[in-house]
Amino acid sequence: MTHYEGDLRPTTARFAIIASRWNARITDVLVAGARQSLAGNGIGEDAIDVIRVPGAWEIPIAANRVAQSGQHGAIIALGCVIRGDTRHYEHVADLCAEGLMSVQLQTGVPVLNGVLAVERVEDAEARAGGSHGNKGEECALAALELVNLMELLP
């Protein structure tokens, strides 16, 4: 039986971080965490592209373009959707996640979903360097592991 598992070894692949400007106080921390995680694992700044889009709704279309270019080993999607008084939250959060999944399945490029969908600002802060860690860092580590795994798989 063959066992495949990625690891955090540095790779020659490029990484794209696509982040929304909406809720920048949160997303800027997520981006910094992702960049720090990649750098801490041997990925140079010249191998990281940061792409900013207006909001979470626009992340999947940018991810699709980046994935289709074939220039990146993985895409790290970062955003923050906070529940409000309308159903808009559900539309944005759910369809963003669905769009990101579609991109990775259609292109074969791993897309890590670090788009926070939270009830309150405090929940987002807890996941952007607070008591629940930094989801940008976690997505970057998962991206690195998946790039390595994709290189191993037949």
Swiss-Prot record:
A Gene Ontology BP annotation from the UniProt entry: riboflavin biosynthetic process
Q: Which GO terms describe its cellular component?
A: cytosol; riboflavin synthase complex
Q: What are the alphabetically sorted keywords of the record?
A: Riboflavin biosynthesis, Transferase
Question: Which GO molecular function entries does the Swiss-Prot or TrEMBL record give?
Answer: 6,7-dimethyl-8-ribityllumazine synthase activity
Biochemical pathway: Cofactor biosynthesis; riboflavin biosynthesis; riboflavin from 2-hydroxy-3-oxobutyl phosphate and 5-amino-6-(D-ribitylamino)uracil: step 1/2
Q: According to its UniProt record, what is one Pfam family this protein matches?
A: DMRL_synthase
Give the residues the record marks as binding 5-amino-6-(D-ribitylamino)uracil. 22, 56-58, 80-82, 113
Reaction(s) the record says it catalyses: (2S)-2-hydroxy-3-oxobutyl phosphate + 5-amino-6-(D-ribitylamino)uracil = 6,7-dimethyl-8-(1-D-ribityl)lumazine + phosphate + 2 H2O + H(+)
Q: Which residues bind (2S)-2-hydroxy-3-oxobutyl phosphate?
A: 85-86, 127
Q: Which residues form the active site?
A: 88 (proton donor)
What does the function comment of this entry state? Catalyzes the formation of 6,7-dimethyl-8-ribityllumazine by condensation of 5-amino-6-(D-ribitylamino)uracil with 3,4-dihydroxy-2-butanone 4-phosphate. This is the penultimate step in the biosynthesis of riboflavin.
Summary of subunit composition and partner proteins: Forms an icosahedral capsid composed of 60 subunits, arranged as a dodecamer of pentamers.
Q: Which PANTHER family match?
A: 6,7-DIMETHYL-8-RIBITYLLUMAZINE SYNTHASE, 6,7-DIMETHYL-8-RIBITYLLUMAZINE SYNTHASE DMRL SYNTHASE LUMAZINE SYNTHASE
Q: What is this protein called?
A: 6,7-dimethyl-8-ribityllumazine synthase
According to its UniProt entry, this protein's organism is Xanthomonas euvesicatoria pv. vesicatoria (strain 85-10) (Xanthomonas campestris pv. vesicatoria)
What is the organism lineage in this UniProt record?
Answer: Bacteria, Pseudomonadati, Pseudomonadota, Gammaproteobacteria, Lysobacterales
What gene is this protein a product of?
Answer: ribH
